[in-house]
From Swiss-Prot:
It comes from Thermotoga maritima (strain ATCC 43589 / DSM 3109 / JCM 10099 / NBRC 100826 / MSB8). This is Putative regulatory protein TM_1690. Pfam families: RemA-like. HAMAP family: RemA. Belongs to the RemA family. InterPro entries: RemA-like. The lineage of its organism: Bacteria, Thermotogati, Thermotogota, Thermotogae, Thermotogales.
Length: 92
């Protein structure tokens, strides 16, 4: 239950669909990105900037972001805590 997460430049991803947020520098991730492109499952949300993170979804889509993985992870946690806070308040 994470809601929508901002991944940069006005782009958002459904938090509940994300499996991993990783650094794109390793060879296996570069191959995964190339395979996703061939399969039509690559989404480039970098707006021409350097890819700093790769987001892997439960539907095997690969999303490229120009935001650092740590920053996106922090946004996940902020959204999670905000949703939890709202749920606690509505139960009172």
């Amino acid at each position: 239950m994470y809601g929508l997460i901002n991944i940069g430049f006005g782009n958002v991803v459904a938090g509940d669909r994300v499996i991993a947020i990783v650094n794109p520098e390793s060879s296996p991730l570069k191959r995964m990105k190339d395979e996703a492109k061939l399969e039509g499952k690559l989404i480039d949300a970098t707006y021409g900037r350097k890819t700093r993170s790769i987001i892997i979804t439960d539907s095997n889509h690969i999303i490229l972001s120009a935001i650092q993985p740590e920053t996106i992870a922090q946004r996940f946690m902020e959204n999670f805590y905000e949703i939890e806070r709202v749920l606690r308040e509505t139960k009172k």
